[in-house]
């Protein structure tokens, strides 16, 4: 989703949350495609705490969210904190939970919060997008992704070594 400001897991399946609950696969499948308010730290008493909205996507391993900040001062401040990597945790507020023991098997997500520390260890921002005027001005930053960097000289050396080994094998 290109017009979002960030994305990440709102909640991940099969992880023990801080409150002892475990979200199970498809527990929030009814929320797929739904847009919910993006709130600062689950603050439901102050309308200024609404800092944007999030589009939810049910996946096999949890619920993924595409977040967009609003243009309020609070939204701009939260956007800056996320872009700088200062705040990365996400947390859902859900109602109508159905549980079997500690397993959550169904629920209705009412909001997604940007929090300092979330209950679900897999719920965090993993991608940030900075919008520019032109498409070329866009910046994508990914967190916690394994990125391998190779210097072109290393690849040339590797090709040369492979060629030499092939030549040696022909001579034998």
Where are these regions (language model features)?
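Short, surface-exposed beta-strand-loop junctions and turns on beta-sheet-rich folds
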Residues: 23-24, 45, 71-73
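Active-site loop/turn microenvironments that scaffold catalytic and metal-binding pockets
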Residues: 31, 43-49, 56-61
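Short conserved beta-strand and strand-loop elements enriched in small hydrophobics
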Residues: 34-45, 90
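Residue microenvironments linked to proteolytic maturation
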Residues: 3-8, 14-17, 37, 53-151
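Short Gly/aromatic-enriched secondary-structure transition segments
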Residues: 19-31
């Amino acid at each position: 989703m290109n017009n979002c400001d960030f994305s990440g897991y709102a909640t991940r399946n099969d992880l023990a949350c801080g409150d002892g609950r475990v979200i199970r696969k498809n527990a929030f499948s009814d929320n797929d495609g739904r847009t919910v308010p993006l709130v600062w730290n689950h603050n439901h008493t102050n309308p200024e705490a609404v800092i944007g909205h999030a589009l939810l996507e049910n996946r096999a391993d949890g619920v993924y969210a595409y977040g967009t900040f609003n243009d309020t001062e609070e939204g701009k401040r939260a956007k800056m904190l996320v872009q700088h990597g200062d705040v990365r945790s996400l947390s859902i507020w859900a109602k109508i939970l159905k549980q079997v023991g500690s397993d959550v098997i169904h629920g209705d997500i009412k909001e997604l919060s940007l929090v300092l520390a979330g209950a679900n260890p897999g719920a965090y921002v993993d991608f940030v997008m900075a919008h520019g005027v032109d498409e070329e001005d866009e910046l994508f930053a990914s967190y916690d992704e394994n990125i391998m960097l190779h210097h072109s000289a290393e690849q040339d050396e590797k090709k040369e070594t492979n060629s030499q080994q092939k030549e040696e094998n022909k001579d034998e």
